[in-house]
UniProtKB/Swiss-Prot annotation:
Protein purpose: May play a key role in the regulation of the intracellular concentration of adenosylhomocysteine.
Name the record gives this protein: Adenosylhomocysteinase
NAD found in the keyword field: yes
Subcellular localization: Cytoplasm
Organism name: Polynucleobacter necessarius subsp. necessarius (strain STIR1)
Any one GO molecular-function label of the UniProt entry: adenosylhomocysteinase activity
Reaction(s) the record says it catalyses: S-adenosyl-L-homocysteine + H2O = L-homocysteine + adenosine
NCBIfam families: ahcY, PRK05476.2-3
Gene designation per UniProt: ahcY
Keyword Isomerase attributed: no
Keywords carried by this UniProt record: Cytoplasm, Hydrolase, NAD, One-carbon metabolism
Amino acid sequence: MNTVSDLSKFVATRCAIADISLADFGRKEIAIAETEMPGLIAIRDEFAAQQPLRGTRITGSLHMTIQTAVLIETLEALGAEVQWASCNIFSTQDHAAAAIAANGTPVFAIKGETLEQYWDFTHRIFEWADGGYTNMILDDGGDATLLLHLGARAEKDQACLNHPTSEEETILFAAIKNKLAQDPTWYSTRLEKVKGVTEETTTGVHRLYQMFARGDLKFPAINVNDSVTKSKFDNLYGCRESLVDAIKRATDVMVAGKVAVVCGYGDVGKGSAQALRALSAQVWVTEVDPICALQAAMEGYRVVTMDYAADKADIFVSATGNYHVITHDHMAKMKDQAIVCNIGHFDNEIDVAGIEKYKWEEIKPQVDHVIFPAANGMPEKRIIILAKGRLVNLGCGTGHPSYVMSSSFANQVIAQIELWNAVGTNKYPVGVYTLPKHLDEKVARLQLKKLNAQLTELTDQQAAYIGVTKEGPYKADHYRY
């Protein structure tokens, strides 16, 4: 922006943020984050001269954090035009949003925004000032992808919007109906311009595979989540640090000695369980998958059911990506002052709607007492709900550390380049794909430099013996890390 008035006009017309005066603070934190994101910065430096994303207009729906600011500026450094919204109503860091807005990027993200604002912002990231269109999506959880597909379906028959199953669906469906009243082809016009999407998280990937199986998916997708340097690092090591940070920021509770239940023992659950055990909690795990349950048992965790644990544990963490894992009846059985939180993507892992009938008392932002009245001979009690059942590490903390997000976001940038460079070819017909192994290994190499790690190099004889090249890839695609 050339002048203060130019910036003020831009923010007023092309952004929705909390406070532009936070931009300098955000810029200082972005500078620190860049020093902790070696993989992402190396990708920026490697490709800047080539401008491989020139011509892209990327709509981004992903937590608007300091680390995401580094991702956005990397995409722009490689030639992309970008518009951004957060994928969660509580996850925005307002100083990060301000810094990005001050740099001239349209951003629509406010910590604590309403659901109405959330879906308005998700629409606005598809509307460009010159009337042009998005041609690439960078998604986290799949809401941006869902919006265009569901809206285009509703253009043909709005009956698909008649039976919402949650408060959020009620608000989303109303927003789509309102947009269709203004422009009956708003969604299909934009949908047909999109060349591909890169998806960040497990929940969004599940959506993509379901859409493809039904024949609904209209463009190719790269599943970034299942890159090894994403899922085995962000999901596991990121959660291992950010979960307990969020719980302690929110409650100041002593974790040691308490019984903590982790629902789900995938990568996120594994990291969560490790973190709680490191603080000397007694960790119990719930699982439906016997393989994951066996892994938990072999790590020394007690494998139980929620029905068994509900009235015994002190801390409950949902990490499944599934629906109503912690139910109203579970919470009704819990101890006074039990802590309940979710580190999965959506808020329906915990049956928050089922306890809305009780009195809620805000302790501080994103920390609430839910007061259960005396019943069945039991006295009144309070349980602590964090982030209203939404993503706790970003609702009550600042999310994963920059270093681990560097791996995830390096994969995102590589995936955007891969899809965009394949436009006009038959390399990626409509479907869901993962990045090839050699790119996964490349990200790992770039990250290792920060840690002063020394890689052993195969001899010619060793490489021949195991049937690989000296440069890699070193493992078959089916290898489980």
